[in-house]
Amino acid sequence: RRVAHDDPFGAWEVDLHGHQVVYRVAGSGPPVVLIHGMVNSSRHWRPVALRLAERHTVIAPDLIGHGDSATPRGDYSLGAHATVIRDLLSALGIGSATVVGHSFGGGVAMVFFWQFPHRVERLGLVSSGGLGPEVSPLLRSIALPGASALVSLAGAERVTDGLERAGTALRRRGSGLGVQLQAIARALRPLGGPGAREAFVHTLRAVIDARGQRVGAADRLYLLEAVPTLIAWGERDRTIPIEHGRAAHAAVPHSRFVELEGAAHFPHLEAPEALAGALLDWIAATEPASLDDEAWRKLLRRRASARPRAA
């Protein structure tokens, strides 16, 4: 069912397993799936999605617990989100796609590839989580007991409005920090609702604890050599360090690394033209992967070997 009419990046909704999932669609052509990060939504992809839609069908879901999708008491793990995306694509009749994820969404995108490799033609990671333990102190603090009050404060209207006003003032003065403050304000606004706050805390604690990111992809990065991989990062990212992206690029043969000038942790909002251009160039320059069970088995057996267990 369509929700938003006369919008080139219009919203639709579908019931999956008894829960409402909202997603946005634009354009026509080979499919590209855009997966947002924590406390973001499909709306934040708009400027990038509209550029990609010139050549592609773009599908951007609101993850469960985010945006306008349902906020049930349930499983907010990376694997659970990946399964919902699989079922959404199946409901839409899409077999495989280029999959791009930002921040937490990058972790979802990687897990989606590991769980359903035959459905991923290319993999794009934008300021992605899961590539190293370091993460901002603010996110680590939210993993601590009793942090719900901090989340409530962060999503308060007076806080987000203040950030928006400060960002507008800085942009008028020509400061790049203004765009970053406005991006943070947009990210925090959904936390104004109690259901979204609870979902955010559950989502964050599934991947982050007081010491940093506790779910990592380092032991499986070798699998990405089987799929065209783009790693894009904001040069000023202080939430997840750009060194994670550089290290992942070095570990994944034939991957492409793009450093986005002037962007911090939200390149799709801070440098949308540069990010969209990088994605379009990468898609045009690569052939889609097509992995069947036999190809996946061969890839795994390069690192895995069965042997009798010692008594």
At which residue positions do the language-model features occur?
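Conserved serine/cysteine hydrolase catalytic core
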Residues: G192-A250, E259
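Acidic beta-to-alpha connecting loop that harbors the catalytic carboxylate
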Residues: S28, E235-D237, G262-A264
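Active-site loop/oxyanion-hole signature of alpha/beta-hydrolase fold enzymes
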Residues: L16, R24-A26, A60-F104, G277
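Catalytic histidine-centered segment of alpha/beta-hydrolase-like enzymes
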Residues: L260-A276
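Alpha/beta-hydrolase fold catalytic core
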Residues: R1-V32, E54-H56, I94-G95, L181-Q182, ...
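Conserved HGGG/HGGXW glycine-rich cap/lid loop of the alpha/beta-hydrolase fold
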Residues: H19-D68
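Flexible "cap/lid" loop of the alpha/beta hydrolase fold
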Residues: W114, R122-G155
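Hydrolases whose catalytic domains are alpha/beta-hydrolase-1, hotdog thioesterase
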Residues: V108-F112
